[in-house]
């Protein structure tokens, strides 16, 4: 299954939710987290690695036959989930086409052993509608302040204009509890499943 975490109004809460969701689901299933943001901010928190998402896409362009080997060689661990280090170059990220994103998801689904893919999706891919249609469910963290509400309402209108009612049917808008991530270090992020956000997600998954 593919679950997308997306929000046009609250990028920080979106990523905290996605990381926590991945770790919790990873306790019982084989989970891969993919960050699809042009500026994830995770490199400093999760550490720098020799390979990242841009390299995986580049390899996909060159040699699809050994894709699974390359994917497995790039996977890193964070708590109970696996992840591919996100792009650290805005230019590299912007050169990835929707066709390549869709091919990547198809190959992971068809060739890997992952039960669940968590997509932490930004608002600058330029292909949100097409990618949202690849998933089995969409989680959207929302805030109550007027600006956030305005952004969500504008996004809803945009989706309806583009005949995206099928996307809205997959959507769950979530008002998250206040976070307790402390200083924002890797150890703080790894503790999210045991904090209020983790309890909220566990209840959400069983409801």
Language-model segments: which ranges?
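Conserved beta-strand scaffold positions in the cores of enzyme catalytic domains, especially
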Residues: 2, 31-33, 81-83, 138, ...
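Walker A/P-loop phosphate-binding motif and the immediately C-terminal alpha-helix
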Residues: 2-38, 42-46
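Structural motif
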Residues: 6-10, 35-38, 86-88, 120-123, ...
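Short acidic, S/G/P-rich loop/turn micro-motifs used as interaction or catalytic elements
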Residues: 10-13, 88-97, 124-127, 144-149
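Phosphate-binding loop that captures ATP/GTP phosphates
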Residues: 28-83
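Cytosolic-facing regulatory segments adjacent to core modules
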Residues: 66-77, 85-121
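Conserved catalytic-core segment of NTP-binding enzymes
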Residues: 103-191
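NTP-binding/hydrolysis catalytic cores, primarily Walker-type P-loop NTPases
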Residues: 186-207
């Amino acid at each position: 299954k593919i679950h997308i975490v997306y929000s046009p109004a609250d990028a920080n809460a979106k990523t905290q939710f996605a990381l926590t969701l991945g770790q919790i689901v990873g306790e019982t299933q084989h989970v891969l987290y993919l960050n699809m943001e042009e500026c994830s901010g995770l490199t400093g928190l999760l550490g720098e690695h020799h390979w990242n998402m841009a390299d995986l896409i580049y390899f996909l362009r060159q040699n699809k036959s050994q894709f699974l080997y390359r994917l497995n060689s790039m996977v890193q661990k964070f708590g109970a989930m696996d992840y591919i280090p996100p792009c650290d170059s805005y230019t590299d990220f912007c050169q990835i086409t929707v066709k390549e994103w869709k091919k990547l998801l198809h190959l992971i689904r068809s060739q890997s052993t992952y039960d669940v893919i968590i997509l932490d999706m930004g608002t600058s891919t330029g292909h949100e509608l097409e990618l949202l249609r690849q998933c089995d469910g969409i989680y959207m963290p929302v805030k109550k302040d007027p600006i956030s509400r305005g952004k969500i309402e504008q996004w809803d209108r945009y989706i309806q204009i583009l005949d995206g009612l099928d996307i809205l049917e997959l959507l769950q808008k979530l008002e998250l509890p206040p976070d307790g991530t402390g200083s924002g270090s890797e150890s703080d992020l790894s503790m999210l499943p045991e904090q209020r956000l983790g309890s909220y997600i566990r209840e959400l998954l069983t409801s």
